[in-house]
């Protein structure tokens, strides 16, 4: 009985090593996408529907609207501009923090 188990164990170990070395389905899709991106030229990249990662992350990180200079100028001092920026920031925070009634509670 012990003699028959040894080849079975070796086959299981070899099978486990082969399966673990193969890329999973998720990572193989990523590998295909990387190969496609490498093959694109600059013009094709501009035409592609997938936005470039650095372009989207840079644009989303930038503040919205016009940001005034923080240095003093002929029109006023930086404290006035800082107050405007603070009020703009508080208005956006207020928009996110508004309380909404729960749908389970009555009127």
UniProtKB/Swiss-Prot annotation:
Name of the coding gene: CEP14
PANTHER family, alphabetized: PRECURSOR OF CEP14
Propeptide: 22-92
Induction annotation: Slightly repressed in roots by carbon dioxide CO(2). Induced in shoots by osmotic stress (e.g. mannitol).
Family: Belongs to the C-terminally encoded plant signaling peptide (CEP) family.
InterPro entries named in the record: CEP13/CEP14
A GO cellular component annotation in the UniProt record: apoplast
Positions of post-translational Hydroxyproline modification: 101, 103
Function recorded in the entry: Extracellular signaling peptide that may regulate primary root growth rate and systemic nitrogen (N)-demand signaling.
Glycosylation sites noted in the Swiss-Prot or TrEMBL record: 39
Membrane spanning stretches: none
A GO MF term: hormone activity
Key words of the record: Apoplast, Developmental protein, Glycoprotein, Hormone, Hydroxylation, Secreted, Signal
GO biological process, one term: nitrate import
Post-translational modification comment from the UniProt entry: The mature small signaling peptide is generated by proteolytic processing of the longer precursor.
Known partners and oligomeric status: Interacts with CEP receptors (e.g. CEPR1 and CEPR2).
Annotated signal peptide: 1-21
Residue span of region Disordered: 43-76
Protein name: Precursor of CEP14
């Amino acid at each position: 009985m012990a003699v028959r188990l040894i080849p079975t164990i070796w086959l299981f170990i070899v099978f486990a090593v082969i399966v673990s070395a193969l890329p999973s389905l998720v990572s193989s899709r990523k590998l295909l996408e990387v190969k496609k991106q490498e093959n694109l030229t600059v013009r094709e990249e501009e035409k592609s529907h997938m936005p470039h990662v650095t372009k989207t992350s840079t644009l989303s990180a930038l503040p919205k609207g016009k940001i005034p200079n923080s240095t003093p100028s002929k029109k006023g001092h930086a404290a006035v501009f800082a107050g405007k920026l603070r009020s703009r920031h508080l208005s956006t925070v207020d928009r996110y923090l508004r309380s909404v009634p729960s749908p389970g509670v009555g009127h």
